[in-house]
């Protein structure tokens, strides 16, 4: 029997805990930043953006897409933040898509059909989650968040594309306020 893949990470956790790395961590992010990005390990925002513990809230999913669940998460954090920050801006949501995204496979009919069967989803609903042109998809997702009625107008949203080849994140949709709320 081989050791579990998590064993090395658990050992590093013990070192982290013994060193007190968790002490003083805050619930509300230090940078007032909420990052939505892909679950691809090449796009780890702690490394790509140089984030430390407590700097940002990070939500990761296939393609870094703004789904209803992600919108609900932003709305929840916004409502919590309104309690802690009675006036002024609450936080910025940075939507980050990336080049060479595996979510592009959702554009392939055969792949999408098999995946839909596997997860029990409507195949037609999955096509819109494909990331073939990250500039276009991040722009779409930023607009989706900005027009979501459940999100506070004190939240700002921006859109970015991370190039996995050169390692740079480029802003493609400048920061602006949520329209609704």
Segments the model singles out, each with a brief description of its role:
Residues 19-75:
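Conserved beta-strand-loop surface patch within small alpha/beta domains used
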Residues 1-29, 64-66, 72, 76-90, ...:
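Divalent-metal-activated hydrolytic enzyme cores
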Residues 36-38, 60, 94-98, 160-163:
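Short beta-strand segments
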Residues 55, 92-93:
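The start of beta-strands in P-loop NTPase/AAA+ ATPase cores
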Residues 39-42, 99-103:
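Gly/Ser/Thr-rich loops at beta-strand to alpha-helix junctions
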């Amino acid at each position: 029997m081989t050791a579990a893949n998590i064993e090395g990470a658990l050992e590093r956790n013990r070192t982290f805990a013994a060193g007190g790395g968790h002490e003083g961590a805050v619930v509300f992010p230090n940078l007032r930043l909420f990052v939505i990005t892909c679950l691809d390990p090449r796009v780890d925002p702690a490394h790509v953006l140089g984030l430390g513990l407590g700097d940002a809230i990070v939500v990761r999913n296939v393609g870094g897409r703004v789904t209803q669940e992600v919108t609900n998460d932003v709305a929840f954090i916004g409502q919590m933040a309104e309690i802690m920050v009675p006036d002024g801006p609450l936080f910025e949501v940075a939507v980050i898509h990336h080049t060479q995204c595996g979510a592009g496979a959702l554009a392939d009919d055969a792949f999408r059909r098999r995946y839909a069967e596997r997860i029990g989803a409507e195949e037609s609903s999955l096509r819109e989650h494909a990331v073939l042109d990250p500039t276009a998809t991040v722009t779409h997702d930023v607009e989706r968040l900005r027009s979501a009625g459940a999100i506070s107008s004190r939240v700002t949203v921006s859109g970015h594309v991370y190039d996995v080849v050169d390692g740079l994140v480029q802003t493609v949709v400048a920061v602006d306020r949520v329209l609704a709320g």
